[in-house]
C-alpha cells in the first residue's frame, strides 16, 4: 500500500437527510403529473429544517425550487404581527407534522403534497374589459399558480380556524392539511377551490 493510498480517507456514506430528523422524502409520490416540477420534495431538495435562507424571489420561477415545506413555513408568517417570525412558524409546522403522523400514521410530507394537489384550483376567472364593459372570462390556471394558491388557501384556513379558538394553530394546520388531503369539504381550502371553479364554470 503506497503512502498516497493510505492518506486518502474512505468516502463515508451520505446520511439520509430527514426533515426535522424524522420524515424522509424518499417515498413521497406526486400523483399529479403537471405539478411534479413545481412541488420541490425530492432528495435533491431535502433539508433538515425548512429554513434555507435562499434567494428564491431574485428570479422568475425560481421559487418553484424552494422546498415545499419551507414555502408552507414562509406562508404561515402572515399578518403584520407574525412578519419575520420564521422560527415560530418552523415550530408550528414541526408540531403540526407530528400531529398529522399521530392521527393518520402516514408520512406528513405525503399528506402535505396530497393537500396541495387537491386544493389548487384548475380553473379561475379573470376580468376582461371591452369598450367600457367589464366581463369575467374563465381561464386555465398555470401549475405554479395552482401550488401558490393551494399553499395560501391552506395557511389562511388554518389561521382563521385558530383565531379565537381554544385549539392551537398547529392543531388547526394539521386538521386543514388532513381534510384537504382527503378532499373533504370540511377544509377551507377545498371549499374555496370548489367555489372558484364553480364561478369559472359559469363564466365559460
From Swiss-Prot:
Tagged with keyword Cytoplasm: yes
Residues with PTM Phosphothreonine: 14
Modified residues (N-acetylthreonine): 2
Covalent link Glycyl lysine isopeptide (Lys-Gly) (interchain with G-Cter in SUMO2), residues: 47
Keyword Ubl conjugation: yes
Principal subcellular localisation of the protein: cytoplasm
UniProt GO cellular component terms: cytoplasm; cytosol; cytosolic small ribosomal subunit; nucleolus; postsynapse; presynapse; ribonucleoprotein complex; ribosome
One MF annotation (Gene Ontology) recorded for this entry: structural constituent of ribosome
Residues carrying N6-acetyllysine: 47
Ranges in a coiled coil: none
InterPro entries: Ribosomal_uS7, Ribosomal_uS7_CS, Ribosomal_uS7_dom, Ribosomal_uS7_dom_sf, Ribosomal_uS7_euk/arc
Cross-referenced CDD domains: uS7_Eukaryote (cd14867)
Modified residues (Phosphoserine): 142
Family note: Belongs to the universal ribosomal protein uS7 family.
Annotated function: Component of the small ribosomal subunit. The ribosome is a large ribonucleoprotein complex responsible for the synthesis of proteins in the cell. Part of the small subunit (SSU) processome, first precursor of the small eukaryotic ribosomal subunit. During the assembly of the SSU processome in the nucleolus, many ribosome biogenesis factors, an RNA chaperone and ribosomal proteins associate with the nascent pre-rRNA and work in concert to generate RNA folding, modifications, rearrangements and cleavage as well as targeted degradation of pre-ribosomal RNA by the RNA exosome.
Name the UniProt record assigns to this protein: Small ribosomal subunit protein uS7
Taxonomy of the source species: Eukaryota, Metazoa, Chordata, Craniata, Vertebrata
Underlying gene: Rps5
Amino acid at each position: 500500500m503506497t503512502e498516497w493510498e493510505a492518506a486518502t480517507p474512505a468516502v463515508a456514506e451520505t446520511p439520509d437527510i430527514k426533515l426535522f430528523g424524522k420524515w424522509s422524502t424518499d417515498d413521497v409520490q406526486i400523483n399529479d403529473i403537471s405539478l411534479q416540477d413545481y412541488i420541490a420534495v425530492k432528495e435533491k431538495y431535502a433539508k433538515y429544517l425548512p429554513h434555507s435562507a435562499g434567494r428564491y424571489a431574485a428570479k422568475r420561477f425560481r421559487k418553484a425550487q424552494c422546498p415545499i415545506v419551507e414555502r408552507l413555513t414562509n406562508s404561515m408568517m402572515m399578518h403584520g404581527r407574525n412578519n419575520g417570525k420564521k422560527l415560530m412558524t418552523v415550530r408550528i409546522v414541526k408540531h403540526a407534522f407530528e400531529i398529522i403522523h399521530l392521527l393518520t400514521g402516514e408520512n406528513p410530507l405525503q399528506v402535505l403534497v396530497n393537500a396541495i394537489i387537491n386544493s389548487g384550483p384548475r380553473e379561475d376567472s379573470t376580468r376582461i374589459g371591452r369598450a367600457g364593459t367589464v366581463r369575467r372570462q374563465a381561464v386555465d390556471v398555470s401549475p405554479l399558480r395552482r401550488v401558490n394558491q393551494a399553499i395560501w388557501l391552506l395557511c389562511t384556513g388554518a389561521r382563521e380556524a385558530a383565531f379565537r379558538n381554544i385549539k392551537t394553530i398547529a392543531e388547526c394546520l394539521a386538521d386543514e392539511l388532513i381534510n384537504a388531503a382527503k378532499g373533504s369539504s370540511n377544509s377551507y381550502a377545498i371549499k374555496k377551490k370548489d367555489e372558484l371553479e364553480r364561478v369559472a364554470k359559469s363564466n365559460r
